[in-house]
Structure formats: C-alpha cells, structure tokens
C-alpha cells in the first residue's frame, strides 16, 4: 500500500508540476512529442472541467433541437434556388432510411414554413422569427466557443450576423459535397458498365471516408472562425482530425442503432426515434466542444 501511495503521489507531482518544467529541446523528437501531447491532454481535461463542457453540450443540444425544423427549411429554401432541393431530399431519405417517419415529419414542417412565408405578409414575419431562432442558436454556439477560448468580448452584431449568414449559405453545399461524392462514384461505375452492387463495400468505405473528410473540414472551419480570437489553422485542423474521426464513428453507430428503433416504430411511430436523436445531438456537441478545447490546448501548450 505504501508503494502504491508513493507512486500515486509521484504521478500527481509529475502531472501537476514537473511536466511543465521539462525542457523539450533536451529530449528526442519522439519523447518531446509525447510530452507535448500529454500537456495538451492535461490542458484539455483542466479546461473541460472548469468550463463545464458537459452542461454546455446539453444546452446547445436544446437550442439545436429547437432550430432543426427552421434550419432544414432555410437549407431547402437555399438549395431550391439552385434546383438541388430534390437531390437533398433523396439524400436525407437514403441516409436515414430507418427513420423515414421522423424525416417525413421534419420535412413536412419545413415545407409548411416555406409555403407560409410565400403566401402572406404574416407568413413572412413567421419565417423571419424562425430564422431568428437559427441565429439565436448560432450566437449561443459562438458564446460557448468564446468561453472555451476565455474571450470576454463577442464580435459586433454586424460581424456576427455576417458570419451566421455565410454559414447558412455554405452549409447546404457542404451536405451536397458529401452526397455528391457517393453519387459520382455510383454513376462512374454505371458509366463503365460495372455492377454497382458488386462494389457496395468500396462504396461504403468511400462514403464514410468522404463523410469523415467533410467533418474534419467543417470542424476545422468552426474552430478557426467561430471564436472571437486568433486561431492558427494548424491547431484547428489537428483538433478537427480528432473530433471529425470521433464524430464519424458516432454517426456510424447512430445509424446502426436505428435498426433497433425500427422495431419500436409499430408501437411509438415517429416518436421512437426522438430519444435516440436527442442523444445523438448531445454526443455530437460533446465531441465538437472537446475538439474546441483541443484547439485551445494545442495553441497554448507552449505558453
């Protein structure tokens, strides 16, 4: 017991004090890299508990749930202007093929928002209210990212709205890029006279690889541009590599568990997918915020 207590005390002293005084230039590259990543992990754990990231993720999950339908409506309004709304609908049904009832519900409400906005002045006012819900959600995302970076002052309102509008315009095309890669691959096989079903395994690998790449790119942009602080892109990218891979794995598991939800559809209908959807959003924000903490740690590890 004394030996265990002594080793525990030494480990605590090393992690709390000694590791921060090590001169990395005196170590080999491998050891220096290991110590640096240990410091990054310690900074992330410390800021994670201090900023109460778990509670922040729950709050953002609530805001995201409120803005799902308005966000989908805005995306369809934007893609509809480019003639891509049908392609996006096809993508959603194929991607969430075990939750078609809840997709029907979300798309139905989203279409109602669009139709109402086009029919009358009051409908336009309602649509603007829904757009404000999205803006409100994104402003809360910025607030949480600023908390991670210990930034007290937010951008002025014009810059915040400009960034949010840019994100709303770009986000549908990020989704379409992901969809387009799989679509082009399938049509290339058909053009070459090859059986698409015979290459289904390769298609799955390409689809998930593309999903991971899009996730890494999206998260790196979030970590770089959302905080009201200078963030080196290399640090944002390294953090995004972790969160993008973790998010892709979580997404795969989410789609696999929808098979279980399908069995409950006969009893609960579309509501069977709601608890799993809420858990998915919560874990997703948890992963994204850990990535934000990592980007902060990478940038300040040598301070």
Label each PLM-derived region with a short phrase.
Residues 2-303:
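Membrane-embedded alpha-helices and immediately adjacent juxtamembrane helical segments
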């Amino acid at each position: 017991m004394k030996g265990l207590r002594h080793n525990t005390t030494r480990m605590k002293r090393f992690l709390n004090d000694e590791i921060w005084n090590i001169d990395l230039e005196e170590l080999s590259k491998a050891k220096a890299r290991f110590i640096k990543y240990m410091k990054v992990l310690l900074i992330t754990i410390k800021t994670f508990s201090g900023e109460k990231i778990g509670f922040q993720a729950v709050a953002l999950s609530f805001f995201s749930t409120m803005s799902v339908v308005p966000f989908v409506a805005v995306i369809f309004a934007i893609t509809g202007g480019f003639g891509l709304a049908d392609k996006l609908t096809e993508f959603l049904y194929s991607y969430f093929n075990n939750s078609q009832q809840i997709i029907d519900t979300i798309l139905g409400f989203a279409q109602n928002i669009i139709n109402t906005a086009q029919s009358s002045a009051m409908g336009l006012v309602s649509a603007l209210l829904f757009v404000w819900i999205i803006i409100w959600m994104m402003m809360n995302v910025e607030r949480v990212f600023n908390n991670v970076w210990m930034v007290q002052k937010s951008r002025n309102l014009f810059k915040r709205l400009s960034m949010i509008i840019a994100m709303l315009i770009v986000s549908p095309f990020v989704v379409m890029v992901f969809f387009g890669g799989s679509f082009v691959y399938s049509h290339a096989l058909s053009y070459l006279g090859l059986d698409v079903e015979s290459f289904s395994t390769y298609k799955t690998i390409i689809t998930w690889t593309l999903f991971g790449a899009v996730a890494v790119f999206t998260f790196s942009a979030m970590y770089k541009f959302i905080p009201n602080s200078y963030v080196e892109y290399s640090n944002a990218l390294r953090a995004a590599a972790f969160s993008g891979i973790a998010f892709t794995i979580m997404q795969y598991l989410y789609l696999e568990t929808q098979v279980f939800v399908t069995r409950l559809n006969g009893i609960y209908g579309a509501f069977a997918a709601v608890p799993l959807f809420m858990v998915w959003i919560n874990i997703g924000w948890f992963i994204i915020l850990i990535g934000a903490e990592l980007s902060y740690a990478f940038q300040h590890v040598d301070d």
